[in-house]
Amino acid sequence: MLDILLLRKDLASAVARLETRKKPQAFLNVEAFQALESERKTIQMRTEELQSQRNQLSKQIGMLMGKGEKDAAEAAKAQVAAIKAELDGSATRLDQIQGELQTMLAAVPNLPHESVPVGSDESANVEVRRWSPDGQQPRSLGFTPKDHVDLGEPLGLDFDMGVKLSGSRFTVMKGGIARLHRALAQFMLDVQTQEHGYTECYVPYVVNADSLKGTGQLPKFEGDLFAAQKGGQDAEPVPDNAQLYLIPTSEVPLTNFVRDEVLAEAQLPLKLTAHTPCFRSEAGSYGRDTRGMIRQHQFDKVEMVQIVHPDKSYEALEEMTRHAEAVLQKLGLPYRVMSLCTGDMGFGAAKTYDLEVWLPAQNTYREISSVSNCEAFQARRLQARFKNAQGKNELVHTLNGSGLAVGRTLVAVLENYQNEDGSVTIPEVLRPYMGGQATLSV
């Protein structure tokens, strides 16, 4: 959530930055905001005036009673009662205004950092760097590559079974390919915990609405979530605050560890990681990536979260991006790093890097990780603070990133390590997790 003081101080600048995002008119109704702010100021000024009058009258009442001027004292008491009634009404309206402002701000995305490229869609994203084991360009396989579907189905990917069990955009894995998927997740966790200093966490796969509000998925993106229904058809409706949702990413539970907490500065940075399934409705994705595992309702991901001092968050962003890159480099997978433009960033991000892995069958790069600095945007919603050197409570900065999406990494391994006979060479770093197995073959 944006700092309302920033909007009050320089609304025009904030609006100008918001207008660089996609569909800015959907974020903030400037006229409605200004009207509420004007009414708030009027009420507060009137409240101060009435409080001053009440204090003066209260003093007069004591003096009048002391002089025996009972009628005048009673008249002053009547004025005080009238002022109290008006103050009570003003307080009620002020609470309503504050609530309306909070609801309005909950729908407003984060302000882009000044270093973010300006643009309306992914065509304006800027390539930062690229990497390949053979130099900057991916090597040619020397034959026409198969995609992961044609490669994977003989090896144990079963899309038909996924449809049978759950519907479209679900996948079943069996045998060696299921083991390879598990090996990737274990390898990623080991890299992040043993080499990069993250604490491994096991978290619930369902969370409450407060958790999703804290990280920004609610209220604006409820349509992207899977709600967990309680009871049967005759069960009573679930109150909003008791509704549970399947996690869209373990960023949600991990970041909510610090909700309503005040940390010691010495505890920063907190570096957390978890391997979980993620559940997304993929609303608005009809017709996109319908073949294979690229866009699924359920997929596994190893998530990285850092809770940091505000002065350190952009250093942490670069560090976390390198942590995600390290996994790709150890796997020998060609990739590029993209700085997302203002129109392509997520709701809570101030700056985002996407890592895109090379898929030979598509002859293109596809997203495999997103690493974002949310600055204080989530922390303000979460009331996540630390006690600074001056002894004052200050909002932390939060960052999150994929380290990596396991299913998409499996896709990349299948396609980049395929052989002309349809077998797949297992990357050397994964072989200890595969009992020494060097290839997947029918």
Swiss-Prot record:
Single Gene Ontology BP annotation: selenocysteine biosynthetic process
Superkingdom classification of source: Bacteria
Family matches, as Pfam families: Seryl_tRNA_N (PF02403), tRNA-synt_2b (PF00587)
Pathway: Aminoacyl-tRNA biosynthesis; selenocysteinyl-tRNA(Sec) biosynthesis; L-seryl-tRNA(Sec) from L-serine and tRNA(Sec): step 1/1
Cross-referenced InterPro entries: aa-tRNA-synt_IIb, aa-tRNA-synth_II, aa-tRNA-synth_II/BPL/LPL, Ser-tRNA-ligase_type_1, Ser-tRNA-synth_1_N, SerRS_1_N_sf, SerRS_core, tRNA-bd_arm
SUPFAM superfamilies named in the record: Class II aaRS and biotin synthetases (SSF55681), tRNA-binding arm (SSF46589)
GO molecular function: ATP binding; serine-tRNA ligase activity
Cellular component per GO, a single term: cytoplasm
CDD domains reported for this sequence: SerRS_core
Domain free text: Consists of two distinct domains, a catalytic core and a N-terminal extension that is involved in tRNA binding.
Family the UniProt entry places it in: Belongs to the class-II aminoacyl-tRNA synthetase family. Type-1 seryl-tRNA synthetase subfamily.
Main function: Catalyzes the attachment of serine to tRNA(Ser). Is also able to aminoacylate tRNA(Sec) with serine, to form the misacylated tRNA L-seryl-tRNA(Sec), which will be further converted into selenocysteinyl-tRNA(Sec).
Record-given protein name: Serine--tRNA ligase
Gene: serS
